[in-house]
A protein has these predicted regions:
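Long, low-complexity, acidic Ser/Pro- and Gly-enriched intrinsically disordered regions
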Residues: 1-117
């Protein structure tokens, strides 16, 4: 642990500050992020890097499907569509949809999406 705290604490601070580079560096130290934590950098990437966003969003969606028990096909499709909206004018709606899917499956996604629980 450095004087700045654990890698997870640095990751969280970097996300809160919108510092994608610092978040990625801390995430590398962690090696594996929870599904919830892995969503936060995608929200940041959605603002600036379109090609990178697509890859990250599809990868996260795959994890959602694999790690969430009882995810229905309509929920999976809705989650993918909600991820796609993060780069456009409906970004807030997309974040709300993802948070609701998370709530239904007991995943605390609201914080990663910068929404109040």
């Amino acid at each position: 642990m450095t004087s700045q705290g654990s890698a997870h604490a640095r990751f969280t601070r970097a996300i809160q500050r919108g510092n994608l580079f610092a978040a990625e560096m801390a995430a590398r130290e962690l090696r594996r992020l929870s599904l919830e934590d892995a969503l936060a950098p995608i929200v940041l990437v959605s603002r600036w890097e379109a090609p990178r966003f697509d890859r990250a969003a599809v990868r996260w969606h795959g994890r959602l499907e694999l790690e969430t028990q009882l995810l229905t096909l309509p929920e999976s499709q809705l989650a993918l569509a909600a991820l796609a909206t993060l780069q456009g004018p409906a970004a807030h709606s997309g974040r709300c949809v993802l948070a609701e899917i998370g709530r239904r499956h007991r995943l605390p996604l609201a914080a990663a999406l910068r929404l109040r629980p």
